[in-house]
Regions:
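Amphipathic alpha-helical interaction segments
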Residues: 67-71, 127, 147
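A short glycine-rich, Lys/Arg-flanked "PGG" loop and its adjoining helix->strand segment in the class I
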Residues: 12-27
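Conserved catalytic/acceptor-binding region of the Class I
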Residues: 27-95
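A short SAM/SAH-binding and catalytic strip from SAM-dependent methyltransferases
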Residues: 1-12
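C-terminal helical/coil "lid" or tail adjacent to the Rossmann-like core of SAM-dependent
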Residues: 82-143
Length: 157
């Protein structure tokens, strides 16, 4: 199986290689997020837009690969057997108790990524994190992200 194909420069080549090495009748499972489905509300439209844009571009990699898994498997010659999608929602989070919503990245690591990709000035890092933490304390924090999964089979020989 594969997860995090979005971190690859060419996800279609990776899936094609999986199809090449799986035996006839064998299966490949693929699961990944699709950052184009990412939604965030922190009571500040400017910060929300900055976060959405950063997550969707993901350092120039194909961050929307999740929704494309079915097509990638099909184009690699695999026969899709099953597909599913699930949306994770984060709403309740106390930044004074944990650095990140359960099962999610921390806002500090997000800010570090934004600085590393020149989408946030280093001098703005603390203010950015503070605004998101303040929104969470006011119960104005919510995020959603959809993951996609595909199981595909190599046709029998």
């Amino acid at each position: 199986g594969a997860h995090d194909t979005r971190h690859l420069a060419d996800p279609s080549a990776a899936v094609a290689e999986m199809a090449r090495v799986v035996r006839p009748g064998g299966r490949v499972s693929l699961i990944d997020t699709d950052w184009s489905t990412f939604a965030i509300d922190v009571g500040d439209d400017e910060i929300a837009a900055m976060v959405r844009n950063a997550m969707r571009t993901e350092r120039g990699r194909p961050s929307n690969v999740g929704r494309r898994l079915h097509d990638l498997a099909h184009h690699a010659g695999l026969a899709p057997v099953a597909r599913a999608e699930a949306t994770q929602t984060w709403t309740r989070w106390n930044p004074d108790e944990t650095p990140a919503p359960d099962g999610c990245f921390s806002m500090q690591s997000l800010a570090d990524d934004l600085v590393a990709t020149d989408q946030l000035a280093p001098a703005e890092r603390d203010r950015f994190v503070s605004k998101i933490h303040q929104a969470a304390r006011r119960d104005q924090f919510s995020m959603q992200l959809t993951m996609y999964a595909v199981v595909a089979a190599q046709p029998p020989a």
